[in-house]
Amino acid sequence: MTNHHDRASSSFGLSGFLRHSSFVIRASGLYLNPLSIFHFLCEFSQMRRAIYPGSFDPVTNGHLDVIERARKLFDEVVVAVAHNDEKQPLFSLKERLDLLRETAGTIGGVRIAEFSGLLVEFARAESAGAVIRGLRAVSDFEFEFQMALMNRKLDAAVETIFLMPKEEYTYLSSRIVKEIARLGGDVSSFVPACVAKALGRKCS
């Protein structure tokens, strides 16, 4: 006989981890789970601030879509630009911050910041209870799942919330946009106008 716990585990999948997100994954694909949304509303209703980290090299329309979705759930969203000396971004840290301030920074309740070191330490310093991650496709999930579990291990008080952008942005990434720009393609439908101009200057 299957007990209540077994039924709940099978509903959420992956050892219950996905009860903290707005969807579950089954062989048939992604779909919204009303019960997981209920858990979200109950457990995160007191959270006022969330961190949306990334390299944003550069910011795309997909990023902005996730930011706007996150803003509907939290009083403040801190868009945190990672400073990583091991990477060689196309845009400098200052340029990425400026582009974000010109785009995402115009959304009410959104603040732009930079960080280095452990994400959970930055979240703690900002008194943020959640980290926002965008999922474009199932292929993103394995890496994000591992990172979310590691962050939970480092600080169980910081939860990870997965948000999916509009379908039209599921294929979009900064890497693809930069490649199109380098090849002389039109990126105006993928990024804000100021970013398209900046890419044109960088890649000309």
Predicted regions and their residues:
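Nucleotidyltransferase catalytic core that binds NTPs
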Residues: 43-204
